[in-house]
Design a protein with these regions (language model features):
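Cation-handling catalytic/transport regions enriched in His/Asp/Glu
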Residues: 1-170
Length: 170
């Protein structure tokens, strides 16, 4: 959420209504997620993750554990997000006459049709409590989280190809 706050604070636009979290859903999660990503970069983490009494930088072995924990189970997390994004799309493609009464059967069929009906990796959010898709402004736009991860990866590659985190690179 800190990335959303930064996005809002640093927006310098003619029409504030179209700044911060009021940008298109395809982009809205990028500032938030890219800032979360930077927070765990070793070069960044060493600037703020210091011992509260001595000021010593985070030890390399602890940094390795933090990185390993962040990378752990990424496939599972991606599958959860993907299944939720697919359900979101399927619900929002229905006409009023097609809305089913059996929500669980609809979910099962929708996930099977998409090839992601794998019980050990269920959707992150089930329809009955999926507030992003029905009340959170993400109607048919939950995929924005996955798209933001792609944009994050592109950002990382750009920085790696252009000399890393430098003042010149922003």
């Amino acid at each position: 959420e800190f990335g959303h706050a930064l996005h809002g604070m640093f927006s310098n636009v003619k029409y504030p209504r179209f700044a911060g979290t009021s940008v298109p859903r395809d982009f809205v999660e990028y500032p938030s997620q890219v800032n979360e990503m930077w927070a765990l970069w070793p070069e960044v983490l060493q600037n703020y993750a210091k011992h509260y009494q001595t000021g010593a930088a985070i030890p390399a072995e602890l940094l390795a554990k933090v990185t390993a924990a962040d990378n752990f189970n990424q496939g599972y997390k991606t599958t959860e997000y993907l299944a939720s994004a697919l359900l979101d799309q399927r619900w929002h493609q229905l006409t009023p006459a097609q809305i089913p009464t059996d929500v669980l059967a609809f979910e099962k069929a929708a996930l099977a049709d998409a090839g992601v009906d794998f019980a050990p990796a269920p959707p992150r959010y089930r329809t009955t409590y999926f507030s992003h898709a029905f009340a959170g402004g993400y109607s048919a736009g939950y995929y924005a989280y996955l798209w933001s991860e792609k944009l994050d990866a592109d950002t990382v590659e750009w920085f790696k190809e252009n000399g890393g985190l430098t003042r010149k690179n922003g």
